[in-house]
Amino acid sequence: MKKLVIIPAYNEEGNLEKTINDITENAPGFDYVIINDCSTDNTLEMCRHHGFHYLNLPVNLGIGGAVQTGYRYAFYHGYDLAVQFDGDGQHSAAHLEDMAKVLEKSGADMVIGSRFIEKEGFQSSGLRRVGIRYFTMLIRLLTGKTITDPTSGMRMVNR
């Protein structure tokens, strides 16, 4: 099974090396591609210097455009699953294999990683937490399903 980690990156020079090391150490069965979204810092130079696998967007498309570029890359290169994985260190690559197993066994089209299941680690701002709780409640009301982190930047999808 071909698996790809899509890392949208805008001005992530301070985080990318750690993120790539996390992926290569904790999810060795996954390939990765960094989508450099026309960063204004040294993100592109860092990718080149370290030999990271990357695509360089000539204009800033925003998070949506960068992620969409990554999904198109995954599709055209025959990946069976792809996961959006923010380049800022909010997520742990140690969870990727478990997510892939859930996706495969459940027959679901998407699995969303949550930053909030474990109480330590990432903490968002108060206003953002209110928004996340609102969306969690709305999704539960409309679907009957509980999604603890609907704004997560770690979403895995199948082909």
Question: Where do the protein language model's features map onto the residues?
Answer:
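Acidic helix N-cap motif at the loop->helix transition within catalytic regions
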Residues: 14-18, 41-49
